[in-house]
Amino acid sequence: MSFLSDLCERASKLDARVAFGESGDPRVLDAAIRLEREGVAHPILVIDPADGAGTAAARKSGLECIDPSNDPRCEALAAALLASRAKHGMTADEAAKLSHDPLAFATWLVKTGDADASVGGAVRTTRELMHFALWLIGPANGVKTVSSAFYMVVPPFRAALAANSSQLSSDSPQADSVPEVLTFTDCSVVPNPTAPQLADIAIAAAAARKKIVGDEPRVALLSYSSKGSGGTSPSIALVQSALQLIRTRAPNLIADGDLQADAALIPDISTRKSPGSPVAGRANILVFPNLDAGNIAYKLTERLAHAKAIGPILQGLAMPVSDLSRGADADAIFHVAAITALQSARFYPSGDQPL
């Protein structure tokens, strides 16, 4: 069974409630209708009365719709916003106005338990979505860095590696170790991570992948250098410092760096560039040194390699909220919702949360 099929099958067993704060967008509405039709999740459409056409389409869909402009829960939402942001200058009037914002209200539904997850960002910016997520939900206990990951589904990856490796053919036992899906992190939240933040990102991505994909995480901290081959630049030192922090904080996590991308993914090259590495040639989580690299890499992989980019999935929040690329199609939104549903702590025993 493919990753996407398995993902939807597991999500369908949860009957998760997923709130959408941009239901007026046709892509979002199409994804929500599909979620309901295929039984993957129960969508909740938070409508915007100012968007007449979008609201009409949402109501016509027959899905559950909530109008925050006349919902009594807005009073509690306004109070929560004011409590969170008054010290930063937010007034009571501003909080009251924001309480009617569909994106804020969708996040509030998760906070209050009226939804298990929320998904936004098809229209609004990551910055807007992150504001509401951090103001209303905040980081999980012990988490200092909230970050994001894309799950890059690359079915042709096995064939590509076989074509580029004398040691790996499509029917080789080693081919089983080549992932169908790669985790790219961070691609949308932390612009220039410090070494502790890189370690946070790697550890959060590994924990999320274990729940979402189900395989053994293998983390490659990427660089233009492999095992110091690029000299002693600050960027290499940063990655190497992050690796030491990972080994201290998560000693059982398979991780290595600094690694060039080809050394992380292609077994033949790894034997020359990083012999003896526990990861090289078998990485399934690629940790980029900064947001420029991560964002560029996922978009190039999506557009040139025809990979399916699912995300950005936020990591490190106390409750599941996911962002979207504004370039996402309905299929990507559908699968982001399925992944986000799987992250809800309601579906895991205490102490076994996905993040």
Regions found by a protein language model. Give the residues of each.
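Anion-binding alpha/beta catalytic cores of soluble intermediary-metabolism enzymes, centered on
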Residues: 1-280, 285-355
